[in-house]
Structure formats: structure tokens, C-alpha cells
């Protein structure tokens, strides 16, 4: 067998065949696209030795901090730190969050070596405060290392990556928790069926999604995690989101029709992933993962930053006992004339996770504040995002999540002009529930069409007026005024004047209200690709606008992204 060089810590009885070394052209490959295709196709998956050499090559190419512990550092410190204690007695650092070490295909020497390496990493990386993926990462790489020191160096390089555009491993609770929120955002957009199931069977859906990294680094069988890691080393963190979304889709497909209890959902998903080889091959998992038309890496990074900012503003930067802050709609303090507590909780599961940390705050209702746009603007300006709810005289219920402060309408003077972001969506609750998101989410090719005309409202020229470098612009998904939005009719989110309010545009309007907020109309529009949300012309019975009250500071206004 050609794998003895990297087989010291491997229990070959557990390993599914070492295989003979394949073509080694990957070791000299410098073209990123070629390397990406090789990784996705499992070019080095059948040879233990080749995979080990590829891992060494890819990890050595990671840009790192100037002072990064290497193999010689490990040899110097391991005796002093571990001493004569048996490896099995070494306590794991708190930052791994009581995560068990997956044994994968390690022999007894390898299992002990993982504890020694983690202990030394804890000594050399005092800035790590939360890294539950570390035990799995060390155990995995040890299969492809000649000795403990080499494994230590490779893990250290991954942890010490200093490329700002290359996120690899979360090392703080803030980064970890914001990743969970980002995964929740992505699940709500790209796995609507599975997400709906999670909302229905769990009291706190983000508590379920907080396990998303564990599904990969901990529960996935060895033959699967290695295929994922092959691609991860080439393409980075976004791959993990893809794979976790694919796992959620497969769980929904296989288990969706079976009864589930809310307190067992996390365990059910863990067991499903652990036994994935019973229903899904590694190739099928990756095929499903890369079939998801996900946001760009830049857009996901911006969403992650927005979630981190929201957590920081609420003081959630270290692990604490979860107080169900993500289930913000409480029966005892929520009262609406339009929706029930359950319906509001369903709506809350659709909104971006960083706002779901907040509690609903009633800003405006026509029953109390009067039927006029001036009163509407008076009570809603200064708040973003907002949730608009409408009940018609025919008892139909619909609404919209609006990402941007209504005061933004003034930036174009008296001209009726669209603004807002790709996080806006419209929905109906009665007679049946349906949500319509930005059309670009399901058809990202529309987002690559730049507006060619000069009349794309205030947004088209604002970045030039503000002197913003186009290379630094935010994504259209999060930006409200820094970005030349894609195809005009696909980016008409919200507009308002003294005469009317429009939500969604392009060959129709998802919602239109007159200046007295008495009558409205709804139709298909290009921005949300929606069906009419209720009767196409309707009379408003009740209209409510809800803001988002910060749980910590009790401040209902959220500032816009910079």
C-alpha cells in the first residue's frame, strides 16, 4: 500500500480502502478553476496518500500571520505542556464547547494525539475563545499527517489565516453566533420547505440552526467530511453553508413526513447526518450543495458582518445561557388587531435573523393614529426595518417586510422614486399563507444585469454623488443607496410620496395605497414575481406598522448599514 507514509494514526480496518495514487497533476496545478473542478469531482478522493499531499500543498498556500506556530514549536512545547500525563486524561479547553472528539478512522494512538494537539493549540492561540469545530478539524487532518507536529502546523496555519477575504474557521462566539444567524437567513431563502418544517416543530428555530456546523464538523461520516474538506480548502467557508443547506434539504425529504417532537429535532438531525450513508452518497450530497444558486461570497460576507454588528449592539459577544431571545413574540405582551401571536411568530421566522433578535413594537395603526399618509410617515420615520400589515374589509390579510427607513423617500425631492434593499418581501396570510421574496434570490442572473438607462431613480446616481468607489459598493441585497441596482424593474422595492405608497414594481405593483390609506390595489410585479396578495382592488379595514425594539437598549430604531 502506498499510504504508509501518512498512515501512522489510521485504523485501516475502518478506512474504506486506501487506493492507489492517482495522477499527481493536481500537485502542480496553479489554475483555480481547474483545482476547484478537481476538488468537486473527488480527483484525489481515492488515494489516501495523494489526498495527504494535496492537503499539505493547499494548507501551505494559506496566507498566515507573520508569527504562526509551526512543527518545531510543537516539538518544543508538547513535553512541557503534556508532561507524563496520559493523553486520555487531558481536559479539552472550554472553547470547544464540550464538543466530543470524533474518532473517524483513527487508531488509539491517533485519538490520544488529538487531545495533545488541541492542548498545545490552546497554549499557542490564547485569542481563541470559541471554536467548537476544532476537535473535528484536528482529528480529520491527523489522518493525513506524518506525525503530530505536522498536524499541529497545518491546523495552526488554518487558524492563523490573515486573508480578510478568506474566512476559514470561527474562533469567537461572536463569529460563531453570527454564522448561525447567517445560516438561518440562507435557510429561510433557499430551503423554504425545510425551514417551514423547522419553524413548525421547534420552539426556537435558531437553536436548531446553531448546530449547523456540528452537522459537518462532528456528525458527518468520514467519507463525507473528507469530500467536503477537499472543496473547503479550495473554495473556503461558503462551501460549509452549501453543504449544511443540502443536509437540511435531504433531512426534509427523508424525514419531513414523519412525526417529530420539538425537543428532539436537534437530535433527529444529528442522527440523520450521522447515518447519512444509508440514504445519500457523498457525490449526491455535493451535487445537491452546488446546485443551490447561493448569493456571492461578497454578499454572504456582508450579511455576516451585519449579523455581527447586530449581536455587538445587543451585547451578545460571549457565550451565555440562551434565553430564547430569538423567539421575540410573547403572548403576554403582543397585541395586534390583524394577526395572532402564532401568525406573528410565523412572520418573525421569515425576517433576517439580526432583526429577529428584537421584539415587535407597534409604531402606527390607523385605528389610533388616523388614516393619512402624513400620520403614517410621522410615526414610521426613523425606524428600519418595519413590518406592514393590512386587513381588508373582506377579512383578507397581507403585508410586507420593508428594510429601509421611509425618510429615504426624501432623497429624490418630490419625485416618486424607489429605494430599499433585496431583503424586502411581501406576503399574504389570509386566505392562505404565501411569501414572495426578491426575484433575484431565485434568479440570480437578473442581478447581473446593470441598469443601462439613466432613470433608475435616486439610486442610480447616488453612489457617484457620494463619491463612493464602485469597487467598495455594498451588494444590492443589503444596500439601499450605495449601489446601482440591477435591472430596474427587478429592483423596485418601496416608494412613497404625499400621494401614495408603492411596494414592489415593474409591470404592476405588489401593493399600492392612496393618500388617505382607505383604498388599495395589488397585482403581479417583477420585483417580487408575486401573485395578487388579496382582491386586486380593496378597501383597508386596519393597517398596522411594526418596528423592532432592541431587547437590551429598548430602542425601536435600527440604524442603516454604513
From Swiss-Prot:
One Gene Ontology CC term in the entry: plasma membrane
Its membrane topology: Peripheral membrane protein
Protein name per the record: TBC1 domain family member 24
Domain TLDc: 337-549
Pfam families: RabGAP-TBC, TLD
One MF term in the entry's GO annotations: GTPase activator activity
Transmembrane segments: none
Biased composition (Low complexity): 451-464
UniProt domain comment: The Rab-GAP TBC domain is essential for phosphatidylinositol binding.
Amino acid at each position: 500500500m502506498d499510504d504508509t507514509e501518512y498512515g501512522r494514526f489510521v485504523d485501516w480496518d475502518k478506512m474504506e480502502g486506501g487506493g492507489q495514487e492517482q495522477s499527481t497533476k493536481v500537485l502542480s496545478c496553479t489554475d483555480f478553476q481547474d483545482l476547484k473542478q478537481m476538488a468537486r469531482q473527488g480527483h484525489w478522493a481515492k488515494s489516501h496518500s495523494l489526498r495527504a499531499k494535496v492537503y499539505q500543498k493547499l494548507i501551505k498556500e494559506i496566507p498566515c500571520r507573520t508569527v504562526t506556530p509551526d512543527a518545531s514549536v510543537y516539538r518544543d512545547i508538547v513535553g512541557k505542556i503534556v508532561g507524563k500525563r496520559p493523553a486520555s486524561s487531558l481536559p479539552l479547553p472550554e472553547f470547544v464547547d464540550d464538543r466530543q472528539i470524533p474518532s473517524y478512522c483513527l487508531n488509539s494512538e491517533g485519538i490520544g494525539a488529538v487531545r495533545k494537539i488541541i492542548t498545545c493549540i490552546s497554549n499557542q492561540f490564547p485569542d481563541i475563545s470559541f471554536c467548537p469545530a476544532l476537535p473535528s478539524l484536528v482529528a480529520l487532518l491527523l489522518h493525513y499527517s506524518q506525525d503530530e507536529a505536522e498536524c499541529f502546523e497545518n491546523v495552526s496555519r488554518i487558524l492563523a489565516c490573515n486573508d480578510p477575504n478568506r474566512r476559514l474557521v470561527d474562533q469567537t462566539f461572536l463569529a460563531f453566533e453570527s454564522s448561525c444567524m447567517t445560516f438561518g437567513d440562507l435557510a429561510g431563502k433557499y430551503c423554504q420547505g425545510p425551514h417551514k418544517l423547522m419553524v413548525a416543530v421547534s420552539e426556537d428555530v435558531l437553536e436548531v440552526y446553531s448546530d449547523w456546523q456540528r452537522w459537518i464538523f462532528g456528525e458527518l461520516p468520514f467519507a463525507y467530511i473528507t469530500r467536503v474538506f477537499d472543496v473547503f480548502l479550495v473554495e473556503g467557508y461558503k462551501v460549509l453553508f452549501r453543504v449544511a443547506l443540502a443536509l437540511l434539504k435531504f433531512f426534509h425529504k427523508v424525514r419531513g413526513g414523519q412525526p417529530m417532537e420539538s425537543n428532539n429535532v436537534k437530535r433527529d438531525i444529528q442522527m440523520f447526518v450521522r447515518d447519512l450513508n444509508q440514504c445519500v452518497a457523498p457525490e449526491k450530497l455535493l451535487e445537491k450543495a452546488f446546485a443551490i444558486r447561493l448569493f456571492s461570497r461578497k454578499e454572504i460576507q456582508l450579511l455576516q458582518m451585519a449579523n455581527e454588528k447586530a449581536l455587538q449592539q445587543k451585547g451578545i459577544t460571549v457565550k451565555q445561557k440562551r434565553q430564547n431571545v430569538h423567539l421575540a413574540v410573547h403572548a403576554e405582551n403582543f397585541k395586534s388587531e390583524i394577526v395572532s401571536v402564532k401568525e406573528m411568530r410565523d412572520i418573525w421566522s421569515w425576517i433576517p435573523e439580526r432583526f429577529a433578535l428584537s421584539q415587535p413594537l407597534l409604531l402606527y395603526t390607523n385605528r389610533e393614529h388616523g388614516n393619512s399618509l402624513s400620520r403614517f410617515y410621522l410615526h414610521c420615520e426613523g425606524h428600519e426595518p418595519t413590518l406592514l400589515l393590512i386587513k381588508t374589509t373582506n377579512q383578507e390579510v397581507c403585508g410586507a417586510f420593508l428594510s429601509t427607513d421611509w425618510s429615504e423617500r426624501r432623497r429624490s425631492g418630490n419625485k416618486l422614486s424607489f429605494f430599499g434593499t433585496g431583503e424586502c418581501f411581501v406576503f399574504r396570510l389570509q386566505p392562505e399563507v404565501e411569501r414572495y421574496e426578491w426575484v433575484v434570490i431565485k434568479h440570480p442572473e437578473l442581478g447581473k444585469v446593470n441598469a443601462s438607462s439613466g432613470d433608475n431613480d435616486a439610486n442610480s446616481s447616488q453612489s457617484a454623488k457620494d463619491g463612493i468607489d464602485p469597487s467598495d459598493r455594498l451588494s444590492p441585497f443589503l444596500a439601499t443607496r450605495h449601489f446601482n441596482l440591477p435591472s430596474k424593474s427587478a429592483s423596485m422595492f418601496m416608494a412613497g410620496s404625499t400621494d401614495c405608497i408603492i411596494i414592489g414594481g415593474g409591470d404592476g405593483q405588489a401593493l399600492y395605497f392612496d393618500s388617505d390609506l382607505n383604498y388599495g390595489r395589488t397585482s403581479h410585479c417583477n420585483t417580487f414575481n408575486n401573485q395578487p396578495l388579496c382582491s386586486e382592488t380593496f378597501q383597508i379595514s386596519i393597517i398596522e406598522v411594526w418596528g423592532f425594539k432592541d431587547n437590551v437598549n429598548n430602542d425601536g430604531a435600527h440604524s442603516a448599514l454604513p
